[in-house]
Regions:
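Short alpha-helical transmembrane segments in multi-pass integral membrane proteins
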Residues: 1-33, 89-155, 197-231
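Short runs within selected transmembrane alpha-helices of multi-pass transporters and secretion channels
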Residues: 1, 79-82, 153-172, 178-190, ...
Length: 231
């Protein structure tokens, strides 16, 4: 303390340094509330989808539960890429390096695409081996459902990773509402289409509905990116 006081007094926290920044508190509260709503809508949608899956009986439920565990691991790569883009965009935007903001999305998107393609191939090729880690080898019907689901949804994963990159970009720029509307639109469409199609298509309905939801979300975010880029 004495060393800092004599050498670097600016590093010490004084009573006059403590206070409330009203505008900053409002911004923080607004971002936090929107992020909470986004997360809530995502998990409410997952509950609705689970309700549709429950109509398939025990094999369908077991297959979907195992498949979502595999998806959770796969999605972590896209989410990490989106978080990295968010940090890069916000830091460069704050520093006034607008050219690097665009490059952050460009290279982050390319990285997400590369990882997304690799993840898709691994899911498609190795779905059976991965599912057997969570399902018994004797549960052939659940394995059949799970393999069909994983292989079908892996074809759409490029849209999932693209959406994650866009989400990171918009969050980094502070456009939290765009991220919220994109997520909410995706999950509502996913839940609605799953409920409509699951009686005829089985678990594949959830995979197709999820893929269409990702495509809608990416289309919405791309339109808004072009709008912001042009202005």
């Amino acid at each position: 303390f004495l060393y800092l006081r004599d050498t670097y007094p600016g590093l010490l926290c004084r009573r006059e340094d403590i206070g409330a920044h009203k505008d900053l508190m409002i911004h923080t509260l607004r971002y936090g509330l929107i992020s909470a709503l986004q997360a809530s809508s995502l998990y409410i949608g997952k509950i609705l989808v689970q309700g549709s899956v429950n109509t398939l009986g025990t094999p369908g439920i077991a297959a979907y539960t195992a498949a979502t565990r595999i998806e959770g691991f796969a999605n972590s790569f896209g989410d990490s890429g989106g978080s990295a883009i968010s940090v890069m965009v916000s830091q460069n935007l704050g520093a006034g390096n607008h050219d690097r903001v665009k490059k952050s999305l460009k290279w982050g998107m390319l990285l997400n695409w590369t990882v997304g393609i690799i993840v898709s191939l691994l899911m498609f090729i190795g779905s059976d081996q991965a599912l057997r880690l969570f399902l018994g080898s004797s549960d052939e019907l659940a394995l059949h459902y799970g393999n069909g689901y994983i292989r079908l949804i892996s074809l759409f994963y490029i849209f999932c990773f693209t959406g994650s990159a866009y989400m990171g970009y918009f969050k980094g720029r502070g456009h939290m509402l765009l991220a919220f509307f994109g997520t909410t639109g995706h999950i509502l469409l996913r839940a609605a289409l799953s409920a409509l199609w699951i009686g005829k298509m089985g678990l594949s309905a959830v995979a197709v509905a999820t893929g269409i939801g990702w495509m809608l979300c990416v289309t919405y975010l791309t339109i808004n990116y072009v709008r912001i880029y042009l202005t």
